[in-house]
Amino acid sequence: MALKQVSSSKCFGGLQKVFEHDSVELKCKMKFAVYLPPKAETGKCPVLYWLSGLTCTEQNFISKSGYHQAASEHGLVVIAPDTSPRGCNIKGEEDSWDFGTGAGFYVDATEDLWKTNYRMYSYVTKELPQLVNDNFPVDPQRMSVFGHSMGGHGALICALKNPGKYKSVSAFAPLCNPVLCRWGKKAFTGYLGTDQSKWEAYDATYLVKSYPGPQLDILIDQGKEDEFLSDGQLLPDNFIAACTEKKIPVVFRLQEGYDHSYYFIATFIADHIRHHAKYLNA
């Protein structure tokens, strides 16, 4: 599958690149970002996938989070895909910021209008990793995932639905229990229909209750001043309770004074990369 390089910039001794390709799963052109650390010049590196939140493209993380120095030092290839298919001309796709374009929610849609293109779960867990493994110096056996908000939800479900595939998982302000929040209800109804039992297959709080192992150490940072926390969109307490019940280790850090923004992510990104490097470089 042909990759077209869109951009390449040197950063902390490595290269921040963006590529475009024709996606089989999403049936449209997709862009994704890839950071190749200096170590990638001489051998295969572990790979860390970042999943972004609502309204984002592949650009937000690479331009705002300041992750490059830590990724360079730890020798990690970092992949950041877009958050939805683009330009599919589906009725209603552009109507709201929390559904359709920029809001794929990392599910495989089953509703007629969306099921042909909106297959972000299969894209980020199957098609994109295959593409990355085939085209870049990565070790497919050493892979981890993290994300923010809707992408934090994505990271958690990808890890929980694929035991052993990802060495570690972390999230910033994730939607932990989307079947119970407004964003989740809207997205799941649109993409998956009204049968709520189908929704549970993409809800971290439900998935963790039936997670069979191997052990997964989960790191979550949450800003205490996050408007979406107080608004009931994120519901981390429900997820932590489910983890505790299942004896799955989760480090949850409520960060005083921080909000939902990339300033919050930039503050703690090095901690998260260190968390993943511990497992990826073991």
UniProtKB/Swiss-Prot annotation:
GO molecular function: carboxylic ester hydrolase activity; S-formylglutathione hydrolase activity
N6-succinyllysine modification, residue list: K4
Pfam families with a match to the protein in the record: Esterase (PF00756)
Keywords on record: Acetylation, Cytoplasm, Cytoplasmic vesicle, Hydrolase, Serine esterase
Chain positions found as N-acetylalanine: A2
Subunit-level organization: Homodimer.
Family of this protein: Belongs to the esterase D family.
Protein's name according to its UniProt entry: S-formylglutathione hydrolase
